[in-house]
Amino acid sequence: MRCPYCGSEDSQVKDSRPAEDGNAIRRRRICPDCGGRFTTFERVQLRELMIIKKTGRKVPFDRDKLLRSFEIALRKRPVDRDRIERAVSGIVRRLESSGETEIPSEEIGLQVLEALKSLDDVAFVRYASVYRDFSHAEDFEKVIAEISAKIARDPGE
């Protein structure tokens, strides 16, 4: 694997272990040329997924972009990294096992919203404000009212 520091084509694996509940392999690597240390993750990819954007343009699915969406919504929120990784892995697994190779971006957005709803209400509102293109305070009030009603119905969750 190419070293991210010096670009050398050779690196050595120093440690390998299961990650993400056995759905990935975490490898600790070292570059023999510059001594740089870095971590890589190896995951099973069932099929090559393409995302259909709102404009109709098709782009390859990017797991890291999905993870960044969660990280942005959950910034400064008390949610463990493991829970975020599990949510992302769950979405990826559902997408890959759906049988479809082309997936509308709206479908991914809905799955992210569902996952955030169970992770953190504030992150859910943050993501919904961008995903649903909120333009007025009333838009926020509606979503917050929905969350408040859910909490009143299911106080234990």
Swiss-Prot record:
- Secretion signal, residue range per the UniProt entry: none
Q: Keywords for this entry? A: ATP-binding, DNA-binding, Metal-binding, Nucleotide-binding, Repressor, Transcription, Transcription regulation, Zinc, Zinc-finger
Which ranges are annotated Basic and acidic residues under compositional bias?
Answer: 11-21
One Pfam family in the UniProt entry: ATP-cone
**One GO molecular function term?**
zinc ion binding
One GO biological-process annotation of the entry reads:
negative regulation of DNA-templated transcription
Zinc finger spans (unnamed)?
A: 3-34
**Region feature Disordered, mapped onto this chain:** 1-21
InterPro entries, A to Z? ATP-cone_dom, NrdR-like_N, RNR_NrdR-like
Any keyword Metal-binding?
yes
The coenzyme or cofactor needed here is: Zn(2+)
Note on how the cofactor is bound: Binds 1 zinc ion.
Residues in domain ATP-cone? 49-139
Q: Report the transmembrane regions from the record.
A: none
Family classification: Belongs to the NrdR family.
PANTHER family linked? TRANSCRIPTIONAL REPRESSOR NRDR
Q: What exactly does this protein do?
A: Negatively regulates transcription of bacterial ribonucleotide reductase nrd genes and operons by binding to NrdR-boxes.
Name of this protein: Transcriptional repressor NrdR
Which organism does this record belong to?
Rhizobium meliloti (strain 1021)
